[in-house]
UniProtKB/Swiss-Prot annotation:
Region (Disordered): 1-24
Record-given protein name: Penton protein
Role this protein plays: Major capsid protein that self-associates to form penton base pentamers, each in the shape of a pentagon, situated at the 12 vertices of the pseudo T=25 capsid. Involved in virus secondary attachment to host cell after initial attachment by the fiber protein, and in endocytosis of virions. As the virus enters the host cell, penton proteins are shed concomitant with virion acidification in the endosome.
Organism placement in taxonomy: Viruses, Varidnaviria, Bamfordvirae, Preplasmiviricota, Tectiliviricetes
Additional note from the record: All late proteins expressed from the major late promoter are produced by alternative splicing and alternative polyadenylation of the same gene giving rise to non-overlapping ORFs. A leader sequence is present in the N-terminus of all these mRNAs and is recognized by the viral shutoff protein to provide expression although conventional translation via ribosome scanning from the cap has been shut off in the host cell.
Keywords: Capsid protein, Host nucleus, Host-virus interaction, Late protein, T=25 icosahedral capsid protein, Viral attachment to host cell, Viral penetration into host cytoplasm, Virion, Virus endocytosis by host, Virus entry into host cell
InterPro entries according to UniProt: Adeno_Penton_B
HAMAP family for this protein: ADV_CAPSP
A single Gene Ontology CC term: T=25 icosahedral viral capsid
Compartments in which it is found: Virion; Host nucleus
Residue ranges, compositional bias (Pro residues): 7-18
Subunit structure of this chain's protein: Interacts with the fiber protein (via N-terminal tail region). Interacts with the capsid vertex protein; this interaction binds the penton base to neighboring peripentonal hexons.
Pfam families reported for this sequence: Adeno_Penton_B
């Protein structure tokens, strides 16, 4: 019988491998394990330091402003508001070596950092940096001896920097006005009664008799109510480039409009009523009721010299009287706002920037200039106003004045307009209070350099030299899986 032979395979095809060959090859090739199973060595929540094995997200990144190792090599020309710090906390690395190291967060995850900051400042409330040590005034600079025609000029007056109470700043402002008069106006024929700008705290209308239209007690009530600005004709005060109006409690009703100036014309309806002349007054004879024309030193009160006010009013105009007793629709109350005095002169905010640590917000672009660093967090400048109630404030002021050897803040005690304003029973001071702020979770970069830039800028994006201590703690954690 003829034996049947298997048919030959088609041309171009190969037979399947034998069982022995398949089993033999599987022993020589390593088993492939997907990356998601490598959790024990390098998972989605792993943090890898250079030259170190992977770790889990149990680390913290500390941003320290005064590390001794960083000062000489990184921060010799910096300050506590703009500094570099090494975040690789290992004593084996110098700051220069740490700058070559990186902290790598697993690329398969989106990372966030819980950012907490500690900020301490030692900023005074009167300083050039905060535009709170100067203001502009328009004063009489000369008076012609022949024609008696006055000349007015603008002057920029500067206060000494320091941390003062509200009444101390008012005294310094008045002293600056008087010193300008002594240096300029007095030499050009200007009289003391023509000092046309005065900062006060009294309510000049107390004791006003609507029938006689005079202040019948014969003197203005020596009690503080609210800071005030008193102007003479032709004079003005400008707070456009000054924040002292916040200390006086005088603000614009529309704060975003450009410029802030108080002129004599703006204070319509705020004329200060004249005093009753007690030397000629007889209670039984009404014809003896006359306004006081001048003080004991012969300084005129300029009674009846403003045709818009009347014969029993001085030509001095008070912002406080114009605001409370003037026309609310067309007067100064329609343009300005009486607010609580802020002895900090208007505290501002500060911005935190961590350009090498946090991802840039979508509204910012990367920058190498501190004034343009992307902002990742913000908080108020840690400067607070403290108010105290002192029932003996005026007594303390008079006692201090009696014990002083000079009357530098009360040069004209005989004149009821120019005398030193009384101190308020509510005394305010500014105080630097350390702040601890939780800024929440911010998106982190997956590759973090070993040396970080940290910048704290003010509202004008300037580096603040008054920052005394700035610390930051960032705790990384996984937010979600990265999707593409």
């Amino acid at each position: 019988m003829r034996r049947m032979m298997p048919a030959a395979p088609p041309q171009g095809a190969s037979p399947p491998p034998s069982y022995e060959s398949v089993v033999g090859s599987s022993l020589t090739e390593p088993l492939y394990v997907p990356p998601r199973y490598l959790g024990p060595t390098e998972g989605r929540n792993s943090i890898r330091y250079s030259q170190l094995p992977p770790l889990y997200d149990t680390t913290k990144i500390y941003l320290i402003d005064n590390k001794s190792a960083d000062i000489a090599s990184l921060n010799y020309q910096n300050n506590h508001s703009d500094f570099l710090t090494s975040v690789v906390q290992n004593s084996d690395f110098t700051p220069m070596e740490a700058s070559t190291q990186t902290i790598n967060l697993d690329e398969r995850s989106r990372w966030g950092g819980e950012f907490k900051s500690i900020l301490t400042t030692n900023i005074p409330n009167v300083t050039q940096y905060m535009f709170s040590n100067s203001f502009r005034v328009r004063l009489m600079s000369a008076r012609d001896k022949e024609t008696n025609a006055p000349t007015y000029e603008w002057f920029t007056l500067t206060l000494p920097e320091g941390n003062f109470s509200d009444i101390a700043v008012i005294d310094l402002m008045n002293n600056a006005i008087v010193e300008n008069y002594l240096a300029v106006g007095r030499q050009q024929g200007v009289k003391e009664e023509d000092i046309g700008v005065k900062i006060d705290t009294r309510n000049f209308r107390l004791g006003y008799d609507p029938e006689t239209k005079l202040v019948m007690p014969g003197s203005y009530t020596n009690m503080a109510f609210h800071p005030d600005v008193v102007l003479a004709p032709g004079c003005a005060i400008d707070f456009t480039f000054s924040r002292l109006n916040n200390l006086l409690g005088i603000r614009k009703r529309y704060p975003y409009q450009e410029g802030f100036m108080l002129t004599y014309e703006d204070l319509a309806g705020g004329n200060i009523p004249a005093l009753l002349d007690l030397t000629t007054y007889d209670q039984e004879n009404s014809s003896t009721i006359k306004p006081l024309k001048q003080d004991s030193k012969g300084r005129s009160y300029h009674v009846g010299e403003d045709p818009e006010a009347g014969d029993t009013f001085t030509y001095y105009r008070s912002w406080y009287l114009a605001y409370n007793y003037g026309d609310p629709a067309t007067g100064t109350a329609s343009q300005t706002l009486l607010v609580s005095p802020d002895v900090t002169c208007g505290v501002e905010q500060v911005y935190w920037s961590l350009p090498d640590l946090m991802q840039d917000p979508v509204t910012f672009r990367p920058s190498q200039t501190p004034s343009n660093y992307p902002v990742v967090a913000t908080e108020l400048l840690p400067l607070r106003s403290r108010a105290f109630y002192n029932t003996q404030a005026v007594y303390s002021q008079l006692l201090q004045q009696a014990t002083n050897n000079t009357l530098v803040f009360n040069r004209f005690p005989e004149n009821q307009i120019l005398l030193r304003p009384p101190e308020s029973t509510i005394t305010s001071i500014s105080e630097n209070v350390p702040s601890l702020t939780d800024h929440g979770t911010l998106p982190l970069r997956n590759s973090i350099p070993g040396v970080q830039r940290v910048t704290v800028t003010d509202a004008r994006r300037r580096v603040c030299p008054y920052v005394y201590k700035s610390l930051g703690v960032v705790t990384p954690r996984v937010l979600s899986s990265r999707t593409f």
